[in-house]
C-alpha cells in the first residue's frame, strides 16, 4: 500500500496567535503529519466586507511576515509547510518561501489565472474538487499541464459535514476519469470517513485540526479534529499501510 500523505490543516484555527500556531505545528508533527497547511488570501476580496466569517479570516490568514516566521519554524522542526494560495500574486511569496508543493482549494479550481501561475512553478499540486463538475476539473487540469504530480481530493463543502453526506464512490470516478492519485479532504469531525477513504485508495488525506473543539472559538472548529483524535487517525492509517493484499 502506498504511503499516505497526511495534511494537518491549521487553517484559521490559530486565531492570529503566532505562539499558538507554532504549538499547533509542533503537535501536528508529533501526531505524525507530513504537512502543515495554512491559507493565504486577502479576506475582504475573497469573502466580502459583510461576510460573517471575515473577522475569523482577518485574524487567521497570515501576513507575509507571519507566513515567513511560520515557514521558518516548520523548517526548524522538520515538517513541511504548505499553503492554499487564492491569488496569483501570492505565488511569488510562496516561491520565495520555498514551498515544495501547492494546495488548490475547491473555490479556486475555476481560477485559471491562478492555476496557470502555479503551473509555471511545475511543483506538485494537491487540488480539492468538491465544488467542481467534470468540465471545470478538465479545464483546471489543462491549466496545470506542466505539472507532473497532481492529486485530486474529493471533499464535501459542508461545514461541518455529516457522515451521510459523503459518497466515497466519487474517489473511484475521479481516479478513473483523470488517471491521477486521489485523496480525501474531510470536513467531518469524525475519523471513520477518512479511514474509509484510505481503504478505497486515497493517498492524500487532509483534515482541519484544532486545540479544543469549542464552536464559538472560530468558524472552522466544528469541522475539525482535536490533536488526540488526529493522532489516532494517523496511527490507524499507518497501521493500514502495513497490511498486505
How does the language model describe each region?
Residues 1-245:
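Catalytic cores and adjacent flexible loops of soluble metabolic enzymes
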Amino acid at each position: 500500500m502506498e504511503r499516505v500523505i497526511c495534511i494537518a490543516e491549521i487553517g484559521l484555527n490559530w486565531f492570529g496567535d503566532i505562539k499558538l500556531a507554532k504549538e499547533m505545528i509542533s503537535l501536528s508533527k508529533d501526531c505524525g503529519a507530513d504537512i502543515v497547511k495554512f491559507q493565504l488570501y486577502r479576506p475582504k476580496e475573497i469573502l466580502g466586507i459583510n461576510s460573517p466569517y471575515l473577522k475569523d479570516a482577518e485574524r487567521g490568514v497570515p501576513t507575509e511576515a507571519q507566513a515567513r516566521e511560520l515557514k521558518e519554524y516548520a523548517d526548524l522542526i522538520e515538517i513541511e509547510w504548505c499553503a492554499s494560495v487564492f491569488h496569483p500574486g501570492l505565488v511569488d511569496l510562496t516561491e520565495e518561501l520555498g514551498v515544495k508543493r501547492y494546495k488548490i482549494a475547491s473555490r479556486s479550481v475555476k481560477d485559471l489565472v491562478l492555476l496557470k501561475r502555479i503551473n509555471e512553478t511545475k511543483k506538485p499540486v494537491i487540488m480539492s474538487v468538491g465544488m467542481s463538475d467534470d468540465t471545470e476539473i478538465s479545464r483546471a487540469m489543462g491549466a496545470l499541464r506542466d505539472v507532473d504530480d497532481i492529486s485530486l481530493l474529493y471533499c464535501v463543502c459542508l461545514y461541518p459535514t455529516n457522515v451521510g453526506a459523503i459518497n466515497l464512490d466519487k474517489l473511484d470516478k475521479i481516479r478513473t476519469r483523470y488517471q491521477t492519485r486521489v485523496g480525501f479532504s474531510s470536513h467531518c469531525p469524525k475519523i471513520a470517513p477518512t479511514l474509509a477513504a484510505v481503504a478505497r485508495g486515497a493517498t492524500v488525506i487532509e483534515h482541519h485540526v484544532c486545540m479544543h473543539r469549542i464552536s464559538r472559538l472560530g468558524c472552522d472548529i466544528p469541522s475539525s479534529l482535536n490533536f488526540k483524535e488526529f493522532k489516532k487517525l494517523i496511527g490507524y492509517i499507518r497501521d493500514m499501510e502495513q497490511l498486505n493484499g
